[in-house]
Curated annotation (Swiss-Prot):
Pfam family, one: RemA-like
PANTHER family named in the record: REGULATORY PROTEIN SSL2874-RELATED, REGULATORY PROTEIN TM_1690-RELATED
Family: Belongs to the RemA family.
Species for this entry: Bacillus licheniformis (strain ATCC 14580 / DSM 13 / JCM 2505 / CCUG 7422 / NBRC 12200 / NCIMB 9375 / NCTC 10341 / NRRL NRS-1264 / Gibson 46)
Protein name: Putative regulatory protein BLi01788/BL02292
Length: 89
């Protein structure tokens, strides 16, 4: 199994293998998830004080806040997978 890393902004990198979902922080259920993670000590704020634009949900129950749009993070993941596929094929 190859370890894939994704840049989520400002030099912060996460493991793509542990990623479950990338969502927008606007909905009430996501806001509740963020608050719950904060209360449990499972919230990682990688926004550097900027507005939260993406919420990354990891398989370890960690919630990561990013200042990068969800589409941008998803595109970085797609590009990374294409590069990996070309290298193998």
């Amino acid at each position: 199994m190859t370890i894939k890393l994704i840049n989520i902004g400002f030099g912060n990198i996460i493991s793509a293998n542990r990623l479950i979902s990338i969502v927008s922080p606007e909905s009430a259920p996501i806001k509740r998830m963020i608050q719950d993670a904060r209360d449990r000590g499972m919230l990682i704020d990688a926004t550097y004080g900027r507005r939260t634009r993406a919420v990354v949900i990891m398989d370890s129950d960690h919630i990561i806040l990013s200042a990068v749009q969800p589409e941008t993070v998803a595109q970085r993941l797609s590009v990374k997978e294409e590069i990996m596929d070309e290298g193998q094929g």
